[in-house]
Curated annotation (Swiss-Prot):
The lineage of its organism: Bacteria, Bacillati, Actinomycetota, Actinomycetes, Micrococcales. Disulfide bonds: none annotated. This protein is located at the 30S-50S ribosomal subunit interface and may play a role in the structure and function of the aminoacyl-tRNA binding site. GO terms for biological process: translation. It comes from the Bacteria. This is Large ribosomal subunit protein bL19. The keyword Ribosomal protein applies. Belongs to the bacterial ribosomal protein bL19 family. GO terms for cellular component: cytosolic large ribosomal subunit. PROSITE patterns: RIBOSOMAL_L19. Keywords: Ribonucleoprotein, Ribosomal protein.
């Protein structure tokens, strides 16, 4: 088991900012199309984080053209170029799955005061 722990520790990223559910983030994802690669930005609200260590993931939700889009990213994935925290949200839950049923201003999250 100690060998697996050392391999896991080596593949953890150290450049991940501190973010939690309710925060609005920009995830810069590296997209490879044939021989070309480009960076695509996915901006939305973090609705939850799951797991720990190498297998930790987070789910980001945004509304694009009146259609809700959710995307789950591994936190320590090499596909992620970097994560940028836009705003901090003031929420009382760890999982914000109730946002899936809300529309318009009801789906808005209060900004945390600093």
């Amino acid at each position: 088991m100690h060998i697996l722990d050392s391999v896991d520790k080596a593949s953890l990223r150290s450049d991940i900012p501190d973010f939690r559910a309710g925060d609005t983030v920009k995830v810069h994802v590296n997209i490879v199309e044939g021989s070309r690669s480009r960076i695509q930005v996915f901006q939305g609200i973090v609705i939850g984080r799951q797991g720990e260590g190498v297998g930790e993931t987070f789910c980001v939700r945004k509304v694009s053209f009146q259609v809700g889009v959710e995307r789950t990213f591994p936190v320590h994935s090499p596909v992620i170029d970097h994560i940028e925290v836009v705003t901090r949200g003031d929420v009382r839950r760890a999982k914000l799955y109730f946002l899936r049923d809300l529309r318009g201003k009801k789906a808005k999250i209060k900004e945390k005061r600093s």
